[in-house]
């Protein structure tokens, strides 16, 4: 009988030290590779607590991080799965957050801001060249390699990152941190790489004056500002900023993603590549002072969130009222944890699941509307050509393809001039990974019979949906109860 061997490679090769940070299902600890003495940061995920979707997200994060090798990105060195735990071994970044370092400097100018955003753009460009969209660019995820002067800026936390094909635009779910979300995400439009460039525009704006371009305690009003692109360059603080810097911000904060500047284009902008002659060298004390207040607000919100998480006395709605994004801090160590804690992930996950379920209900309603209207063309656009079905009209047989359904559309549904109204009751949606879902519901159909009397039919339906190229298609349904076509 063959025996199964449990992997113990992490336990054998690495020694664990103090905790650097903590999330819902993971902890980050300093570790050392025993054979070399090299220090790293280990993100330790308790896989026993993960759902199937969480497992998929973990695999995606590891796959993405393995792909990205750049001096301005926190590097994944190892990914090891052991019994009950998964270990992601990252660079040990000890310089803390970029924004915290800036406020500790004696001198900070527009040219320094240019150098910071250049490194961020280099990391984003590398991601985009490799078909990766980060989706959560914000100050908390911009770290410094060390405490040394001139240490490299490192982009961290790829927990929300996605893989895209070329310039593909699709709906990948509602993800990000409120103040850095792009208009297209808020509109629930298909999106892609340009969302990262919008976030870069928000970050650059903050780097120059110490406060964000979009701000409101009320989240709905904040989102309205973002969708309208309602920002400006108020006096007096913007009077000393060069026109070239403002031009780059305008190109990044362009509402239309198709017209928004790309990372490679931004790196060629004069304010970036001709910094020494274009960017101002004047010390910006007002920016430093404002940035201190901005950082303090973020830390306060982080402390409040930590308390809420500890007591579990929180709701998705309360978490969504944090436009800056927040971080949970568990360690007094100077070492920075390189994962976003539950600040954005809880918010996004709750919002993402809710939005995706609503999407399935909406597309199901569209399909039923096509049936009621006798619109076979609209029906075929929503259904897979190989659609399988169990329905009363088929007398218990499994039917495949469109021909069986075409008969009813052409000979009954399209020729009916009776008013029909359908209600979906108690819809239950099960999300199966990122690209599949199942919905079960009661369907009530109201119509007028041949004698002009109102009638109601009831059926119980289950539909299976699969997303291809960003579009949901019905691949299977099972209906019991009344048939589709109202009987006189």
Swiss-Prot record:
Activated by Ca(2+)/calmodulin. Binding of calmodulin results in conformational change that relieves intrasteric autoinhibition and allows autophosphorylation of Thr-287 which turns the kinase in a constitutively active form and confers to the kinase a Ca(2+)-independent activity. Keywords: Acetylation, ATP-binding, Calmodulin-binding, Cell membrane, Kinase, Membrane, Nucleotide-binding, Phosphoprotein, Sarcoplasmic reticulum, Serine/threonine-protein kinase, Transferase. It is an enzyme of class 2 (transferase). It catalyses: L-seryl-[protein] + ATP = O-phospho-L-seryl-[protein] + ADP + H(+); L-threonyl-[protein] + ATP = O-phospho-L-threonyl-[protein] + ADP + H(+). GO terms for biological process: positive regulation of cardiac muscle hypertrophy; protein phosphorylation; regulation of cellular localization; regulation of neuronal synaptic plasticity; regulation of protein localization to plasma membrane. Residues 325-350 are annotated as: Disordered. GO terms for molecular function: ATP binding; calcium/calmodulin-dependent protein kinase activity; calmodulin binding; protein serine kinase activity. It comes from the Eukaryota. The modification Phosphothreonine is found at residues 287, 306-307, 341, 346-347. Signal peptide: none annotated. InterPro entries: Ca/CaM-dep_prot_kinase-assoc (IPR013543), Kinase-like_dom_sf (IPR011009), NTF2-like_dom_sf (IPR032710), Prot_kinase_dom (IPR000719), Protein_kinase_ATP_BS (IPR017441), Ser/Thr_kinase_AS (IPR008271). Residues 283-292 are annotated as: Autoinhibitory domain. Calcium/calmodulin-dependent protein kinase involved in the regulation of Ca(2+) homeostatis and excitation-contraction coupling (ECC) in heart by targeting ion channels, transporters and accessory proteins involved in Ca(2+) influx into the myocyte, Ca(2+) release from the sarcoplasmic reticulum (SR), SR Ca(2+) uptake and Na(+) and K(+) channel transport. Targets also transcription factors and signaling molecules to regulate heart function. In its activated form, is involved in the pathogenesis of dilated cardiomyopathy and heart failure. This is Calcium/calmodulin-dependent protein kinase type II subunit delta. It comes from Bos taurus.
């Amino acid at each position: 009988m063959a025996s199964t061997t449990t992997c113990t490679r992490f336990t054998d090769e690495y020694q664990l030290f103090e905790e650097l940070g903590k999330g819902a299902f993971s902890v980050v600890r300093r570790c050392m590779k025993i054979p070399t003495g090299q220090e790293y940061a280990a993100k330790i995920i308790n896989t026993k607590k993960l759902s199937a979707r969480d497992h998929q997200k973990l695999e995606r994060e590891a796959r993405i991080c393995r792909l990205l090798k750049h001096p301005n990105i926190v590097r994944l060195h190892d990914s090891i799965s052991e019994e009950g735990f998964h270990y992601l071994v990252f660079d040990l970044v000890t310089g803390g957050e970029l924004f915290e370092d800036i406020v500790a400097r004696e001198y900070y100018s527009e040219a320094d801001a240019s150098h910071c955003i250049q490194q961020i753009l280099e990391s984003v460009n590398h991601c985009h060249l490799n078909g990766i969209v980060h989706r959560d660019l914000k100050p908390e995820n911009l770290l410094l390699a060390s405490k040394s002067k001139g240490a490299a800026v490192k982009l961290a936390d790829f927990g929300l990152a996605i893989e895209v094909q070329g310039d593909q635009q699709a709906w990948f779910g509602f993800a990000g941190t409120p103040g850095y979300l792009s208009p297209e995400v808020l509109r629930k439009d298909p999106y892609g790489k340009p969302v990262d460039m919008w976030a870069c525009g928000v970050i650059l704006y903050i780097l120059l004056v110490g406060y964000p371009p979009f701000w409101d305690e009320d989240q709905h009003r904040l989102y309205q500002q973002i969708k309208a692109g309602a920002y400006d360059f108020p006096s007096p603080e913007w009077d000393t900023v060069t026109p070239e810097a403002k031009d780059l911000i305008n190109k990044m904060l362009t509402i239309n993603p198709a017209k928004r500047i790309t990372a490679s284009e931004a790196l060629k902008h004069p304010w970036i590549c001709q910094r020494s002659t274009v960017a101002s060298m004047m010390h910006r004390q007002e920016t430093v002072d404002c940035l201190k207040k901005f950082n303090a607000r973020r830390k306060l919100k982080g402390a409040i969130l930590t308390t809420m998480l500890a007591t579990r006395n929180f709701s998705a709605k309360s978490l969504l009222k944090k436009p800056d994004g927040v971080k949970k801090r568990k360690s007094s160590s100077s070492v920075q944890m390189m994962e976003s804690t539950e600040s954005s992930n809880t918010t996004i996950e709750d919002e993402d699941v809710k939005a995706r379920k609503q999407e399935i209900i909406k597309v199901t309603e569209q399909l039923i509307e096509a049936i009621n209207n006798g619109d076979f063309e609209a029906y075929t656009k929503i259904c897979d050509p190989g659609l399988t079905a169990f329905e009363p009209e088929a007398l218990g047989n499994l039917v495949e393809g469109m021909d069986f359904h075409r008969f009813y559309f052409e000979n009954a549904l399209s020729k009916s001039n009776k008013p029909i109204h359908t209600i979906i009751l108690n819809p239950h949606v099960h999300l199966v990974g990122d690209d599949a879902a199942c919905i079960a519901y009661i369907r009530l159909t109201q119509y007028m019979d041949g004698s002009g009397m109102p009638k109601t039919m009831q059926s119980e339906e289950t539909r299976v949906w699969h997303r291809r190229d960003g579009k949901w298609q019905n691949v299977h349904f099972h209906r019991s109860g009344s048939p589709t076509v109202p009987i006189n």
